[in-house]
Regions:
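Outer-membrane beta-barrel initiation region
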Residues: 2-31, 40, 44
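Residue-level signature of outer-membrane beta-barrel architecture
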Residues: 3-5, 44, 75, 89, ...
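Repeated loop/turn-to-beta-strand initiation elements of outer-membrane beta-barrel proteins
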Residues: 7-12, 48-52, 79-83, 108-113, ...
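Transmembrane beta-barrel strands of outer-membrane/channel proteins
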Residues: 12-16, 54-58, 85-89, 115-121, ...
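Extracellular loop and loop/strand-boundary signature of outer-membrane beta-barrel proteins
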Residues: 15-18, 22-28, 58, 70, ...
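Residues that define the transmembrane beta-barrel architecture of outer-membrane proteins
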Residues: 32-38, 65-69, 93-97, 132-138, ...
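Detector for outer-membrane/organellar transmembrane beta-barrel domains
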Residues: 65-126
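Outer-membrane beta-barrel "beta-signal"
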Residues: 142-147, 177-191
Length: 191
């Protein structure tokens, strides 16, 4: 959700994962909110295709909560690749970098396939959240969405995720999965 104009925007992003049944973190058959992230960002256009963003990110799940200062660039690279690169700085000298890339392949005016990839890199180990320094995880996938209106598009898709380095080691020690595939469904909307 955003409020503003093409030059200045206030953006509220939320992302979460709710799992039903077989749980990738502990192989139990339960249902729970696995991950919840909220971002409040100020976005300023710096060129016709690029925005500078600054604000706050809160990792609300898994516990303990982590709060970060966010600084990033979001825009459209050549060949219509959407890029989102954000540096996060948290307390106790925590740092993170997230890079996301996606490209919309239009089949019709309303139906599109969106391949995407996202990677997360952390500056130090965080034992409480089982996050390791270095390349932590990569998620790659595809979403198929249908725009009922330009502002409202349900989607289905599949994602493959894999943990690396110390993050994978922490997961193996806790007898958790370090990779897997999952089906996703949701609604993309804006107003």
């Amino acid at each position: 959700v955003w409020l503003g104009d093409d030059l200045n925007k206030l953006i509220l992003n939320s992302e979460g994962e709710y799992r039903h049944g077989d749980n990738r973190h502990n192989n139990e058959h339960d249902s729970a909110t696995e991950e919840a992230e909220l971002q409040l960002l100020y976005s300023r256009a710096i060129t016709a295709y690029w925005n500078f963003q600054a604000g706050w990110r809160g990792d609300l799940q898994p516990t303990p909560e982590r709060h970060w200062l966010a600084l990033g660039l979001e825009g459209l690279a050549p060949w219509f690749i959407d890029v989102n690169a954000t540096l996060f700085v948290g307390n106790e000298e925590r740092t993170a970098l997230r890079l996301g890339l996606e490209h919309e392949l239009m089949f019709t005016q309303r139906l599109a396939l969106v391949p995407e990839i996202e990677l997360n890199v952390y500056g130090r180990n965080d034992l409480e959240t089982a996050t390791g320094a270095g390349l932590s995880d990569v998620t790659a996938g595809m979403r198929l969405h249908y725009e009922i209106t330009r502002e409202f598009a349900p989607y289905v898709g599949v994602h493959y995720w894999k943990q690396y380095g110390n993050t994978a080691r922490f997961s193996r020690v806790d007898d958790e999965k370090t990779d897997g595939a999952e089906f996703v469904a949701g609604i993309h909307f804006w107003y």
